[in-house]
Amino acid sequence: IRSSIGSAEADVTLDNIVESDKPIGIAGRIQTEDLDIGKIIDNDLLGPATLKTAMKATLGNEDHPSEIRIDTLKIDRLNANHYDYSDITAVGNISSNGFDGRIVCHDPNLNFLFQGAFALSAKTQNARYKFFTNIGHADLNAINLDKRGMSRVHLRASADFTKSSAGDLRGKIDVGDIELQNSTGSYKIGNINLVSYSSDSTYVI
């Protein structure tokens, strides 16, 4: 499909279309070239995207939850907030009860790794979060997040915590090797550690 807002190509198979008691399955490959996502979803913060992906999805029903499995996702161009990101890859599983995935970006102005998992307990409605990220280099001015001039950051972070149905957080979040750079110089902030726990009726951060 080619249009004034870019092109898209899909090779997709559908399963269980006429069987109402089974979830609909979708599998295949999708490729876009300069497809203006922002115009499609009416969002000014997003623009053209050039990508390739191979995925499988299940459109759930009352007996089967929805799920998306991304086997490969390679983004050559993604315009977001008026900046063209490049060289992004991702894999992962997304469902109504969780997420488990990995994202790597080697853009000239944003180099980072994110790997994490999220799970929601259907019984207690408690959510478990566990992730690690390493931002090797982020030029916040170049990617239009800081308009004041030179603004660069480097850090790593990890987290392992549970969020209860009441909103309480229990676990730890560690942010380390924080280094900031602006027009006045470079600043090594060091490490920040947050620990939260509860005992009886006491909640401590």
Predicted regions and their residues:
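Interface amphipathic segments
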Residues: 1-205
